[in-house]
């Protein structure tokens, strides 16, 4: 399936659901949820957003909900776009979970990606999350093989 609204375009699995949210301060968010509860979320922020502050806030929020939270610096490179911030591991209802937050700065906006899944599903879903992020960069930012 393809999401293509409000200047944001990406592909997502057919059996996932989409929720959109916007705020008066210009922040637009989309969450794609899998039937099993895993999700990938994208938030478009103003270009001058402080990613370090956003990541610190996310870490504090997660730590408040999951006291055993472990956070690690992390980064990815997709089509020459550097996405950095953090990986998280935590327990919830006797299940271990993994989450990632990645940030991408452009001249027009800042983008924050957040994805989360139970560890038993992470090895499969991590590739789905990355494909969704890659399709966003290719479709919205215009980088990648299809834009040559």
What are these regions (language model features)?
Residues 15, 35, 79-81, 104-110, ...:
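Short, solvent-exposed coil/turn segments at beta-strand boundaries
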Residues 1-5, 32, 76-77, 88-90:
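Short acidic-hydrophobic surface loop/beta-edge motif
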Residues 16, 113-148:
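Surface-exposed amphipathic alpha-helical segments
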Residues 57-108, 145-148:
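Signature of long, low-cysteine stretches enriched in small and polar/charged residues
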Residues 2-56, 60:
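Secretory pathway targeting signatures of secreted, lumenal, and periplasmic proteins
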Residues 2, 15-22, 63-78, 138-139:
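Short secondary-structure junctions
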Residues 51-52, 94, 119-123:
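Loop/helix-junction capping segments adjacent to catalytic residues or to phosphate/diphosphate-binding pockets
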Residues 25-40, 106, 135, 139-140, ...:
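Short, charge- and proline-biased low-complexity linear segments
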